[in-house]
UniProtKB/Swiss-Prot annotation:
Native species: Drosophila melanogaster
Ranges of residues in domain PRORP: 291-525
Protein's name in the database: Mitochondrial ribonuclease P catalytic subunit
Source species taxonomy: Eukaryota, Metazoa, Ecdysozoa, Arthropoda, Hexapoda
EC number from the UniProt entry: 3.1.26.5
Reactions performed catalytically: Endonucleolytic cleavage of RNA, removing 5'-extranucleotides from tRNA precursor
Length: 544
């Protein structure tokens, strides 16, 4: 056991904070319930590692030192802070020891503390099977939280869901109403969705329809599922090969529909699955050569271009769903929109539509008006030298920029200046779409909100059109030359070419993937074969 003198050396007390823990005190104050990473790691390594329990006196000293030593830690949140430090899968006994300590001194653990304890149970569940006693403890905590609060806040709902999915039987399905409860005040988190979808795939009798519904809800809300969901499905298919072709096809189509990159963990599991059932699946890692040629199967990836019918639908819906949306008129007027549409009818079609302000400020905002105007003129010259017809969109204040540079723009391009308060993007996209399917546009803006407002059916069509037609400025050299990023003409998400799927993957999962059109470095080349022998039930070790 640690003695109290050693504990006082490890933990700062009021007026005598440990020098190492005082580092970076000027930085942003941590949120309640958390500790800065360096101090958290020291507390974990110096005190909690390899310990399964602490004495009451030790817990008292830990608690007092944290409350006295940190302004953001108080008697209300200190318990959650401590359980946040004891959160590793092998620290369940230590976390339970602290909760028992609280109860022994007559303190009732609050919802945040019990929620943190449920997350530790869940971490242990992903490392080893939980005992019946541990599962009973989880259910008791969940029942007590729900009995005390008719409506749980979103954080408590998420914690209870993580507890319920760590149990066997049907109790995990009690998490579904909690997911609906979260929707009352917020969008359910990636963690809550993923926990339930993973469980739906991995239970003895899979709830596949439910799992896919949850995945669709997540992706539609721009919340990419965690790796564990895909791994649960792949582990299931390793044991039930009869379902592999249909379910794997659903997975690949899902990744394509929502332009999701899986992580390397999932890619490795797909390769392992392929080696387990070579009669059904052939998977290789690959990379792309010039013009999107797969270096494994030698096929070219599918062109990103959309069909004439898809372009027609996109053009017709854009005006209604984006250009005349209420928040556009908050930054513009119906009169200005009408004036712009009349201008486009008179001067279109264009080969390229340029966002003048976006170009001007793309190499930095601390430029003189003369430098800003000169950069816009340089981009116009880039396209005029290719004999392109150009439209430049800007704001009224650009009239005050360098007369020489703006004169060049005016003489070599159509120029439309909106009110200084207007949004440029809707005007830019309208003019580009109105000019036809061959017209490009020049902007660094990723157009996320516009894609979102087009809806789930048109969003992927818009994204493909955007990828094919968007140019942007990379930089301007010291000699004044510009380096332009040209569009990638092949698809960048999972898709099928003939009998082969090409699936991009990234190094690790991120809940906030970029929307940029960068070519992924890593790909899988997957061929699903027609089944020629009866499916067998393969005995494999399931990875949680």
């Amino acid at each position: 056991m640690y003695n109290l003198r050693l504990l006082r050396n490890l933990l700062p007390i009021a007026g005598h904070a440990h020098p190492r823990w005082l580092a970076s005190q000027h930085k942003r104050r941590p949120q309640p319930g958390s500790l800065p990473a360096d101090r958290l790691d020291q507390l974990r390594s110096d005190l909690f590692e390899r310990r399964h329990e602490l004495s009451g006196a030790e817990w008292t000293e830990v608690r007092r030192s944290l409350v006295d030593g940190y302004k953001h830690i108080n008697g209300h949140n200190v318990d959650a802070v401590i359980l946040g430090v004891c959160s590793a899968p092998n620290q369940l006994s230590l976390a339970k020891s602290y909760v028992e300590f609280l109860r022994s001194r007559g303190s009732k653990p609050n919802a945040a503390t019990l929620g943190r304890l449920l997350r530790v149970y869940n971490a242990a569940y992903h490392e080893r099977p939980l005992s019946e006693a541990e599962q009973s403890e989880i259910l008791q905590i969940c029942r007590s939280l729900q009995a005390e609060h008719e409506t749980l806040d979103a954080s408590s709902c998420e914690n209870v869901i993580h507890g319920l999915v760590a149990t066997s039987g049907d109790d995990w399905q009690r998490g579904l109403p909690l997911l609906e409860m979260m929707k009352v005040t917020s969008t359910p988190s990636v963690a809550a969705y993923s926990a339930l979808a993973e469980k739906a795939f991995s239970v003895a009798t899979p709830e596949q329809e439910l799992a896919w519904r949850l995945l669709e809800e997540m992706a539609t809300a721009r919340k990419p599922p965690k790796c564990e969901v895909y791994l649960a499905l792949l582990n299931r298919l390793a044991n039930e090969t009869a379902q592999l072709p249909a379910q794997l096809s659903l997975l690949l189509q899902f990744l394509e529909r929502h332009e999701i990159l899986v992580s390397q963990r999932v890619a490795i599991r797909l390769q392992e699955l392929s080696s387990q059932v070579p009669q059904l699946l052939h998977t290789r890692t690959t990379h792309l050569g010039g013009l999107g040629k797969c270096q494994s199967c030698q096929q070219h990836l599918q062109p990103v271009a959309i069909s004439d019918e898809e372009f027609r639908q996109l053009s017709e819906c854009f005006l209604e769903r984006v250009l005349i949306r209420r928040d556009v008129f908050q930054r513009s007027t119906p009169e200005e929109v009408a004036r712009f549409k009349k201008f486009v009818e008179k001067t279109a079609p264009y080969d390229c539509v340029i966002d003048g302000l976006n170009v001007a400020y793309s190499t930095g905002t601390k430029k003189t008006p003369q430098q800003l105007a000169k950069l816009v003129a340089t981009v116009v010259r880039h396209f005029r030298e290719q004999d392109k017809r150009v439209l430049v969109l800007g704001r009224e204040h650009m009239r005050n920029w360098s007369k020489q540079a703006m004169h060049y723009v005016h003489c070599n391009a159509s120029l439309f200046l909106t009110s200084n308060l207007s949004h440029d993007d809707p005007f830019l996209l309208y003019a580009t779409l109105r000019s036809g399917q061959e017209t490009d546009f020049f902007s660094r803006d990723l157009m996320r909100s516009h894609a979102f407002h087009l809806g789930t059916e048109l969003k992927p069509i818009f994204r493909r059109w955007q990828q094919e037609h968007q140019f942007s400025l990379v930089t301007q050299t010291q000699t004044g030359q510009i380096i332009v990023k040209e569009p990638v003409r092949h698809r960048l998400c999972a898709h099928q070419v003939a009998d082969t799927w090409h699936v991009p993957y990234c190094a690790q999962y991120t809940p906030h993937p970029t929307d940029s059109f960068e070519v992924p470095a890593n790909w899988l080349c997957i061929q699903m074969k027609e089944q020629t022998i009866p499916a067998t039930k393969t005995k494999t070790k399931t990875t949680r």
